[in-house]
């Protein structure tokens, strides 16, 4: 068991190191886009299913609260938290619409929409990002495996080079933390 534990940690680290080699510059670029949007009075909308929903909520909390520095709250909304909205939309319009309809209600031109899906093929995430794109938001996808359908529709896509859901999710939350740290730094230096 001890060797298994070490192997799992090594695999997690290796995936993250491979990921950062592929995406370091894009991470900086996307952080700048998010910081500029927030500085300009726009907001970040985040969504996903299951563990990806938890990541969306976690990232939103870091932006609205604080990550490392005391600063003004930054407007970010996880579209995964209101059970009345989620169940009403799921019941009345179908589960595939639960993010699309919220995006239609809340998204404005200049906002940033982050859709998180380990497979890249979650229909509700795809539809949410498409709607955000149509409404003039910058769209960002966190995904894995081969990128899935979501890789074809987002302005910026981060594809974790793994086919294991847990490794993809571990990398997604690390990416979220890195973006929060960079965005916070950029917003504070620009204030």
Swiss-Prot record:
Reaction(s) catalysed (UniProt annotation): 2 D-sedoheptulose 7-phosphate = D-glycero-alpha-D-manno-heptose 7-phosphate + D-glycero-beta-D-manno-heptose 7-phosphate
Lineage: superkingdom: Bacteria
E.C. code: 5.3.1.28
Domain SIS: 34-191
PROSITE patterns (alphabetical): SIS (PS51464)
Cofactor note: Binds 1 zinc ion per subunit.
Any GO MF annotation of the entry: carbohydrate derivative binding
UniProt cofactor(s): Zn(2+)
Binding site for substrate: 49-51, 62, 91-92, 117-119, 122, 169
InterPro entries: GmhA/DiaA, Phosphoheptose_Isoase, SIS_dom, SIS_dom_sf, SIS_GmhA/DiaA_subfam
Binding site for Zn(2+): 58, 62, 169, 177
Other facts noted in the record for this chain: The reaction produces a racemic mixture of D-glycero-alpha-D-manno-heptose 7-phosphate and D-glycero-beta-D-manno-heptose 7-phosphate.
Stated role: Catalyzes the isomerization of sedoheptulose 7-phosphate in D-glycero-D-manno-heptose 7-phosphate.
The protein's name in its UniProt record: Phosphoheptose isomerase
């Amino acid at each position: 068991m001890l060797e298994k534990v070490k192997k799992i940690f090594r695999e997690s680290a290796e995936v993250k190191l491979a990921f950062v080699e592929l995406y370091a510059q894009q991470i900086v670029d996307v952080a700048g886009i998010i910081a500029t949007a927030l500085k300009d009075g726009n907001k970040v909308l985040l969504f996903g299913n299951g563990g990806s929903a938890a990541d969306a909520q976690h990232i939103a909390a870091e932006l609205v609260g604080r990550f490392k520095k005391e600063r003004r709250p930054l407007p970010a909304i996880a579209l995964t938290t209101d059970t009345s909205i989620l169940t009403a939309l799921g019941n009345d319009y179908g589960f595939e619409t639960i993010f699309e309809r919220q995006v239609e209600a809340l998204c404005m031109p200049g906002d940033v929409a982050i859709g998180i899906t380990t497979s890249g093929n979650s229909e509700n995430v795809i539809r949410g990002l498409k709607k955000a794109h149509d409404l003039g938001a910058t769209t960002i996808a966190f995904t894995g495996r081969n990128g899935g359908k979501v890789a074809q529709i987002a302005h910026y896509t981060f594809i974790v080079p793994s086919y294991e859901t847990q490794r993809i999710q571990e990398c997604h939350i690390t990416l979220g933390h890195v973006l929060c740290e960079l965005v916070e730094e950029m917003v504070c230096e620009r204030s």
